[in-house]
């Protein structure tokens, strides 16, 4: 913890960014404790949220009430590829909520395949991204680990990046999943040269084996500062590459999700947030 605090002295003045939270983290609380959960996030000190469409009707009014700004939202891949009518609905919903970044959160197993599948996906993403830009919004892609595994000699990651226009598809980089796939988040952030506009922040337990599947042990997920990732270096690279928004996220928590994000918030505060 002392190392976190010391690093914060060097990093704090450079970022000046508000810290957000991905509401997927509190999905289990929304059915019965939505109001107190959103209020708790505001009391912790979060200023921004990233939403997911399935719970927007419940959480968006509460975010407005408690002063949490929705800046990004997860919309299912099926909406993104259903142009133009299906995707226009995503644009309309985002604009109504004040969301700037429409994020593709996940590619379901049934939508994965060989290189041609990802080339077709990239074409649809380019079309959706163009519609986004015309509406004053930004389309982003959130990666997991599978994108870094080879399929017929090619990585989906490389296909998606090379076949899409950086102006129409930015990235939401999840540092946990980058590390699970055996890559260095710091190097990847820098290699992307500013294409990563959003960052998901969560830590990884020591000793988690390299893999391209999302089927990791729940114990692999750790709060920021309680795992093996080098967050001072990650945040320095992100600041240098002008990442625009940062979101704490925990796919799985050992206990209370609110307590989990509180821990990450406090440790990130020591790094200058």
What are these regions (language model features)?
Residues 1-13:
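N-terminal export signals
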Residues 6-8, 48, 78-170, 191, ...:
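Active-site acidic/histidine proton-transfer and metal-coordination neighborhood
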Residues 14-16, 38-43, 56-72, 86-99, ...:
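Acidic (Asp/Glu)-rich catalytic clusters
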Residues 14-32, 37, 44-48:
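Boundary/entry segment of secreted carbohydrate-active catalytic domains
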Residues 17-22, 49-51, 70-75, 102-104, ...:
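Hydrophobic faces of well-ordered beta-strands that scaffold small-molecule active sites
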Residues 21, 41, 49, 63, ...:
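Conserved, mostly hydrophobic/aromatic
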Residues 27-32, 48-60, 77-85, 109-113, ...:
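Acidic-and-aromatic substrate-binding clefts and catalytic sites of carbohydrate-active enzymes
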Residues 133-228:
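Acidic/histidine-rich catalytic cores of soluble enzymes
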